Amino acid sequence: MNKIKILSDRKTSSHILSVETITDIVQYLESYPRIFVLYDISVKGYADKLIHKINDINGTTGNQKTVDSFAMIAEEEKKNMQSVMQVCSWLLEKNADRNALLLGIGGGITTDITGFAASIYKRGLRFAFVPTTILSQVDAAIGGKNGVNFMNYKNMLGTIRMPEFVFECPEVLETISYRDFVSGSAEMLKTFIIDNRDYNYEKAVRIFSLIHSSKDKDSSIKSYKKELLTLIHAAADIKADIVSRDKYEKGERRKLNLGHTFAHAIEWQASLTNKQTGGSNNISHGEAVAIGISIAADLSQQIGICKDKELARNIQNDFVSCGLATASPFQPASLADAMKKDKKTEDGMVHFILIESIGKVVEKNLEVEKVLNIIEKDK
């Protein structure tokens, strides 16, 4: 079992635990008299498996632990306050008290809604996650950020509150789709660009490229399961280290936003375009992050942060070999509004994270218009 401890505050702590199967987490749930399971309908099989295990233990031990469950459709359009209120209404209807545990099983949308609802219901309910996508295992479920979208803007409303547990389960890699894998791989590469301990960036590019070039990509993911788990744990470890030193994102934690200012603007523009045209050209968060990092790499060279004139091209070539997009489908000017409303904007300046080299990033405060002008000229 791999265990990482993140100190949350003087009263609580948050643990990341790697367990073999989803039923192995039951031993960590013994102290909770009631468990409320919120799960993505697409991973119903995992939720059912866990609930059945808890009920089996109840039957053999005579325990009276009760389990209630609530299925949600985990789509970006559902990542809003209405969904959070639905969960709170369900908890209230079931008379959930503050001794209970809210357990979210699913990807980043599910963990965000779980954490947000638990943060505000009765001023705080204990909660835990079973992230079922690579992206949520290495990023979304770690660190205590719980956010939902508002007026199409990404994660505009939210809380910072740590889950008591994050259970990382390799079993979920057996059923992960290739698109989800690609989305998660972008967040892993982002993490290793920030901190390239043990040359994990190069290792990740090699494994992801082999999977992408395979004729049967889904089978290839399973074939490289051992290597992927090592990379997942490494990425989770890096993020946990950073969060433990800067819970409220006052300094070092901002590094984890590499590519995200551009990514959130691209996601916002994609959502807006779909609403205007009735289209369904959805860009996943990981795909947008890959594009955002590529733009950040170009910008880093243009303003002299990165002295290596080949770095941006090398990163983009690496990303393409891993099956990731590197070019934005939208004109830079169309991203201005979303970037100005980004959470990282203060006094008209955005905290951009730029790349000095693989393993070293820096923060630079820049005006949105200046950045977009540079990007436009570089096209």
Put a short name on every predicted segment.
Residues I109-F116, Q137, H264-A265:
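Short glycine/serine/threonine-rich phosphate/pyrophosphate-binding segments
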Residues S213-A333:
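Active-site segments that bind and position negatively charged phosphate/pyrophosphate groups
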Residues D9, F116-I211:
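A glycine/threonine-rich phosphate-anchoring loop and its flanking beta-alpha core
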Residues D68-F70, L103, A128-V130, F165-E168, ...:
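Hydrophobic/aromatic beta-strand patches that form the interior of the parallel beta-sheet core
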Residues M1-L101:
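ATP/NTP phosphate-donor binding region
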Residues A74-E75, I105-G107, L258-G259:
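Glycine-rich beta-strand-to-loop/alpha-helix junction loops that act as flexible
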Residues A186-M188, I305-K379:
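C-terminal charged capping/lid subdomain of soluble metabolic enzymes
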